[in-house]
Amino acid sequence: MYIVNSYTLAIIFCFITMICWGSWGNTQKLASKNWRYELYYWDYTIGILLFALLLVFTLGSFGDSGRGFLEDIQQVEAAYIASALIGGAIFNASNILLSASVSIAGMAVAFPLGVGLALVLGVFINYFSSPKGDPFWLFTGVVLIVIAIICNGIAAGKNQKAGTNNSKKGIILAAIAGILMSFFYRFVAAAMDLNNFESPTTGMATPYTAFFIFAIGIFLSNFLFNTLVMKRPFVGLPVTYKEYFTG
């Protein structure tokens, strides 16, 4: 599998991740004119699964380091598979709530509150469960990012049309989403040997395999979580699978 050994490249990948994490909500808003978020969310989860498949059969299978995907997936123990699946289910539940909040209260409210809570709580939870890195720079960075998110929310809020009221329901959903999202990574991390990517502990997953199992957890849990939201939406009338397939 391919392993990032360059610090500079790792930072670049982090920036790409941040851009993607902060941009997917825009696609939801663009689609919302004629595509309910409950239906959009199926596209979102299917996209994650397809990307995971592409990743494990390319970067996760090429190279001389570590275990290739097909070799690795066969030896992962059931407990670690379950852990990554649980992480996917938790992430999916939180993201559905965040999407609902975006559709109700708008991105200016949902993202600063939901993602901000997830970021702050997630750093504390994951750092104290597995302390790595310089805490000063880590928590300084967190504070700066949170300030940036808050400023972005304020700026976006001022840009809204006069008279727009943020729904209390949307704020509550964003807060619950943020709290849930802060817990998902520890379950995914528990499935991996984070100390040795080149020769991972037998029975544990490589990052590529863990991400693939995580994506399966998202997709499978969507049949429960999103079906419930489709039948009992937070706002608007129920939607059906027929509407999804007819477009």
What are these regions (language model features)?
Residues 1-247:
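Polytopic alpha-helical membrane proteins, predominantly small-molecule transporters/carriers
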